[in-house]
Amino acid sequence: TVSYPESCYQFGDKWYYTYRPNGYDSDIKWETTETYNIGLDYGFLNNRIYGSVDYYQRHTKDLLNTINVISGTNYSSVITTNIGEMDNKGVEFAINAVPIHTKNWKWTVGLNYTWNDSEITKLNVIDSDANFVQTGAISGTGKTVQVFMVGQRPYTFYLAKQAYDDNGKPIEGQYVQPDGSISATETKYATNKSALPTSYLGFNTQLTYKNWDFAISGHGAFGNYVYNYVAADQYVQSVYSDQGNFSNILRRTKDSGFQNQQLYSDYFLEKGNFFRIDNISLGYTFQKLWNGSSSLRLTLGVQNVATFTGYSGIDPEIYSGIDKEVYPRPRVFSLSANLNF
């Protein structure tokens, strides 16, 4: 069996880690993908404008994922196995332009856009009480908020539809049922909202003037959703203190008014659209130094400059779509020197 150093035992005042067996699938296979695509490269005005257009279709077999298993059937409550098949189709478009090109000036601009549609077409194993496979664990006790379901996108969120009062405030413990009624029954449903974006955007531009150069690059993703587990796990008003002007209640906790956890409420499902400015750099090149063949380039740069998003958490760029224990991306300032001789 596969083992990991996850168990620990206490002897005296010290804890010692040891290996314990974990579940595995002895019949697991490699995930395979067949891809078909057609593309076109183009250029105009002596390649002052150029780029490409591609259309692709992909069929993935033996799709790998970690899913819950029935208690007592293995050494673990989850296992990595082949769950089914998936289709992808999409369009990739890229355009580059040189708007200015003179003796002293040069300006280049690049833009790429991708649209992608994915769908689960077959499931090898399904849960006994429903036609889907659960995934997206939010705790070590089997709680999940995502599913793989035939006809739906991968990592579709599976939550209860929160009920709201006339003022738009969520009603604790009340959910909208499939027939439109409101009750305390926590009926979960496939939200048709996935952790995977439907489109991606990339951008870069560079401006040079004599020995100076300035560059910006960024990227974005749209159509994806993020389950804010950090908020769902902590925004419980009963654990805070409210003593008049001395209150430690978070604003969002006060807005919801929840006294208890509502982990399966789609109140905590948010749009994950974002655009991030990844890098900005400014450089200067000193040419013909010393013997005339040497050069020195100095560059001042900033990484992770800014993120534009409506998401309330720290970072909307989370592949799993579950905001849980995400380490913040640092903003990095750098000064570099490159000497050639």
Regions found by a protein language model. Name each.
Residues V78-D87, D129-P154, T191-Q206, Q234-S238, ...:
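C-terminal extracellular loops and terminal segments
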Residues E119-T121, K169, G173, T185, ...:
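Short acidic/glycine-rich loop or secondary-structure boundary segments that cap or lie
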Residues H219-Q303:
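Extracytoplasmic gating/loop element in the C-terminal half of outer-membrane beta-barrel translocons
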